[in-house]
Amino acid sequence: SEYIRQILSEYKSPKFDYLPSFTGGLVGYFSYDYLGYKEKSIRGKAKDTEDFKDVDLMLFDKVIAFDNLCQKIILIANMPLDAPETGYNKAIVELKQLRELLMHGEKKQNMGGKLLGEVTPLFDKEQYCEMVEKAKHHIKEGDIFQIVLSNRLSAPFEGSLFDTYRVLRTINPSPYMFYFSGTDVEVAGASPETLVKLENGVLHTFPLAGTRPRGTTEEEDKELEAGLLADEKELAEHNMLVDLGRNDLGKVSKFGSVKVEKLHSIERYSHVMHIGSTVRGEIRDEYDALDA
């Protein structure tokens, strides 16, 4: 964490209202296993069969941002402050090179993508049910409040993951979408949920739980919404996530600043609707994004 903080302090990109929220810096992922470095008691013993790194971050000092609303491209090049004149001239050259690449670069052919075989789960039904029973035991014993049991689905794939991601953006537009190509891993995904966000000293987390399919008509959509908001099980699960969100933000927020800004709001997406809430807090002076 301290090494990452050092990089962030040395390569801190300025913020301007007329520019995108990201103008340069670190991009990548922290795996769930990374939490074990902060919370020793929950460090996992299982081996990841895909050999994902615990942390994979890349530093970017140039950005090409596409404004979907205004349909325009913004080119950004960062410059060091220790040699402003040299840095400025270098940034101008880099911006011209980026523009030339976009205007006259070789056009990429869309390769698409397809699955070459059946989708298979990591755990079969018997193994998964065994995990459920084990989880229920730990809940009864008070070891945990809630657990998300995952089951990886795998299939052989051929083609371009980036082109597949472009299709995903079209058929399932979501608030949180990503494509990441590292040295040894390529990942794409779409999610309605942003786990945590820190901006201008304010933390937000967005609990999302409780799901129904979208209706084929507006009337059916409203009926499904009413049924979702009347479902005691769905509301209980959602309220637990809200409480956990308040508790988590409270660990790094100023006393008395944690509040529920929005509770039990229906959020609609292309295929489903969810119950969503928003929890905010003001981060303490001694903490930063890595602590959050």
Residue ranges and their predicted role:
Residues 1-292:
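Extended alpha-helical targeting/anchoring segments
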